[in-house]
């Protein structure tokens, strides 16, 4: 089988396997910088729903035991919404005990990679009208397939470039030997 035939076969197999429910194991490396993330809630448009958004918090002052203030509620109005948005600081607890230097944003601890639960893409079923839509894909699947296609194209380009130079090199060697 020619190298281009092998490459085509590899491309087809690589694109078909993820659709059959066979996934590669993801290896993640964790560093001390990746141990915390910002707790972010992205608002989505739904009728008659209250939208919440996480806002950066100012440094928390240290109060004496007898002067502890009540938690304050931040209210914000977005364009195109009828009601106010309410963010309660009590719902997003900061991990200041674990990270005493992080004073400017509300942080939550990232679970360790060993406790992350990977679900099979075939078991995830979108809710609503997307169930029967053949053109609907979740973001994880799109990213995975996009990276796969990019990797195949990258390797194909390298093979094409190196095969052309190898031909020229072998031709050059033959001409010098004569």
Curated annotation (Swiss-Prot):
Annotated Polar residues bias: 103-125
Region: Disordered, residue numbers: 23-131
Biological processes per GO annotation: microvillus assembly; negative regulation of calcium-dependent cell-cell adhesion; positive regulation of sodium ion export across plasma membrane; potassium ion transport; sodium ion transport
InterPro entries for this protein: FXYD_motif (IPR047297), Ion-transport_regulator_FXYD (IPR000272)
PTM note: Glycosylated.
Gene encoding the protein: FXYD5
Organism: Homo sapiens (Human)
Composition-biased stretches (Low complexity): 26-36, 68-77
GO-annotated cellular components: basolateral plasma membrane; membrane; plasma membrane
Protein name: FXYD domain-containing ion transport regulator 5
């Amino acid at each position: 089988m020619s190298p281009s035939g092998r490459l085509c076969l590899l491309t087809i197999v690589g694109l078909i396997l993820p659709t059959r429910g066979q996934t590669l194991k993801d290896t993640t490396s964790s560093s001390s910088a990746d141990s915390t993330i910002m707790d972010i809630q992205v608002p989505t448009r739904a009728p008659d729903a209250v939208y919440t958004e996480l806002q950066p918090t100012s440094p928390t002052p240290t109060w004496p035991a007898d002067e502890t203030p009540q938690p304050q509620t931040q209210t914000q109005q977005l364009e195109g919404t009828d009601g106010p948005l309410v963010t309660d600081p009590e719902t997003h607890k900061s991990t200041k005990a674990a990270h005493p230097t992080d004073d400017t944003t509300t942080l939550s601890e990232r679970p360790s990679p060993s406790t992350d639960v990977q679900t099979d893409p075939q078991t995830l079923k979108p809710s609503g009208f997307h169930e029967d839509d053949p053109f609907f894909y979740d973001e994880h699947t799109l990213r995975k397939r996009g990276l796969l296609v990019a990797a195949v194209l990258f390797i194909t380009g390298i093979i094409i470039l190196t095969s052309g130079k190898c031909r020229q090199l072998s031709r050059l060697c033959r001409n010098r030997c004569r």
